Amino acid sequence: MRILGIDPGIARVGYGVIDTSNGQQQMLDCGIIRTNPGIDDGERMVEIASDLRQLIRRWKPQLAAVEKFFFYRSSTTISVVQARGVIIMTLARFRVPVMEFPPMQIKLALAGSGHAEKDEVLDAVMRELNLDQPPRPDDAADALAIALTGWFQR
């Protein structure tokens, strides 16, 4: 099964693609979709949707796993929620099933504790995907953790 993990954001959207068809998890790709901070949020949403469409066409995921947020008053909350909506809509247009996970569930699935530190989750990502080096940037590593959670929780 090919799974696309997504760490939503407005400035940077992390993505990670894993394949599980050979009995073990393998990283195929990871990175970020970076938007131009000099344009309005609507145009940034167009950039996110366009780049995500390219990823979907390239990797043809059978499942998407997206981080679900619970915000407590933040100036970027509305923009990130809007970006997340664009991501979910784009996946739906390509008929990619979506699973959503809050951060604590991702930490629990990978590190065994919903209160695990970021480095514990990163260690689990490296172990599960048999990586010698940590994926960079952090948003991409987070997206791989989300993809793995999708695999474990499917």
Swiss-Prot record:
Any GO molecular function: DNA binding
Cofactor comment text: Binds 2 Mg(2+) ion per subunit.
Annotated positions binding Mg(2+) 2: 67
Compartment list: Cytoplasm
Keyword field: Cytoplasm, DNA damage, DNA recombination, DNA repair, DNA-binding, Endonuclease, Hydrolase, Magnesium, Metal-binding, Nuclease
Catalytic activity: Endonucleolytic cleavage at a junction such as a reciprocal single-stranded crossover between two homologous DNA duplexes (Holliday junction)
Disulfide bonds: none
Named cofactor requirement(s): Mg(2+)
SUPFAM superfamilies membership: Ribonuclease H-like (SSF53098)
Active-site residue numbers: 7, 67, 139
Entry-linked Pfam families: RuvC
GO cellular component: cytoplasm; Holliday junction resolvase complex
Binding-site positions, Mg(2+) 1: 7, 139
InterPro entries, per database record: RNaseH-like_sf, RNaseH_sf, X-over_junc_endoDNase_Mg_BS, X-over_junc_endoDNase_RuvC
Gene Ontology biological-process annotations: DNA recombination; DNA repair
Function of the protein: The RuvA-RuvB-RuvC complex processes Holliday junction (HJ) DNA during genetic recombination and DNA repair. Endonuclease that resolves HJ intermediates. Cleaves cruciform DNA by making single-stranded nicks across the HJ at symmetrical positions within the homologous arms, yielding a 5'-phosphate and a 3'-hydroxyl group; requires a central core of homology in the junction. The consensus cleavage sequence is 5'-(A/T)TT(C/G)-3'. Cleavage occurs on the 3'-side of the TT dinucleotide at the point of strand exchange.
Subunit structure: Homodimer which binds Holliday junction (HJ) DNA. The HJ becomes 2-fold symmetrical on binding to RuvC with unstacked arms; it has a different conformation from HJ DNA in complex with RuvA. In the full resolvosome a probable DNA-RuvA(4)-RuvB(12)-RuvC(2) complex forms which resolves the HJ.
Family, per entry: Belongs to the RuvC family.
Name under which the protein is recorded: Crossover junction endodeoxyribonuclease RuvC
Encoding gene, per UniProt annotation: ruvC
